[in-house]
Amino acid sequence: MNIKMMLLCLASTSCWAQKDSVNSLSVDLNFLSHGEVCGGGLPKPDDKDDYTEDRSSFLFGRTRLIVDYGRKGLQAHAVIQNSAIWGMKGNQALNLYEGWVKMTAKNGLFAQLGRVALSYDDERIIGTNDFATAALSHDILRVGYEGHGHQAHAILAYNQNGESVYSNTYYVNGAQYYKNMQTVWYHYDVPTIPLGASLLFMNIGQQSGDPADAYHHPSTKYQQMFGGYLNYHPKFLTLEASYYRQTGNQVDKYMGYIPIRAWMASAKATVKPSECYDVELGYDHLSGDDYIPVNYGGLNMVRHEVIRGFSPLYGSRTKFYGIMDFFYESAYSNGFTPGLQNAFAGANYKPFDKFTCSATYHYLAVTTKLHELDRTLGHSIEIQARYQFSKGISLSAGYTQMHGTETMARLKQDDSSKLAHWGWFSLVVSPSLFTTKW
């Protein structure tokens, strides 16, 4: 009888201890192996002759060590990241991709401090851009409230190139893209209908100047981004729309600053008749700079009195304007942005649980009126597929082909007579190493 009572007490104590566990710790790994083969579509470098081939292939690896700690009211998260091209000697990018602590109160208030991978709405303006080799993160303080369908966030950032008691300089070659940044984001989910709405305001300070020039002190210029995003998703249908404006001033090495007057709008509809497939249709319009003719084959850098070319800032561009990202990742040869019209249609198909595939067509054109040139840049077709082997192991692959026009050749200083193509694959392995609670 005494033995039975002791066993019962031990069992109940064990259950109580498991129920009362307040701390959790997990350690995970994430391996990404990525390969690309591409050709065509890029400007010819000035130091290359006309016979230089525009093609390349490479393999890339990224490893992440992910540590998570949590208890009631407190979270801590760290991601150490190494990324490099296979065969590269030295200069491998080993950094802290994320490292933050977050404190949460019972009433929904929270404060988060550290290096954070930010993602808002559809990631058009602020996203992780995880398809890129190193992805994006920001050193910030974020405070806010979340509850009852409301989300309100305020973000503050202040960056330095290094510790100094003599100056407060931060130039554009720093780890981040700005000297300081203030952002306010608000989102509301309507309880009676499947509608979500967001508002965003950003104030971004960029510093100009020459660190070696003691006579010209650094100057910080500010630009603003503000707008909204809507998502309406009744049964079988999702409607999305966004509109943003850019104002303020852009840092310029020679002129000090240039005023910004730019805007963008987008709309997208997705119909999902079944769990196996969906179709989508959409249009993006990004404003462009005034056109100034340039001579074919020369740089002829253009200086505008007003910047009218919209910049997606810190968004995940490959999600929207074609996965090759011809138009914002690689600059136009004469230094101006002619804007972009992107009309697209696509379909996603999931024949069984572990496999998905998609195909998308893009019609691409500039928004700026050009002299003696048509606005059409070209036509692009993208095919992608993904197979989930097991939990934490997946393989993705894709192929894109674009046929550029004479307009594309003139603005990018490339050869429009040949097809631009890009093939890629990504193998992701994410094992969970350790999980415990106490």
Which functions belong to the PLM regions below?
Residues S56-E163, H187-P191, A269-G315:
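Outer membrane beta-barrel
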Residues L42-D46, I80, A117-I125, I155, ...:
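Flexible, solvent-exposed coil segments and beta strand-coil junctions
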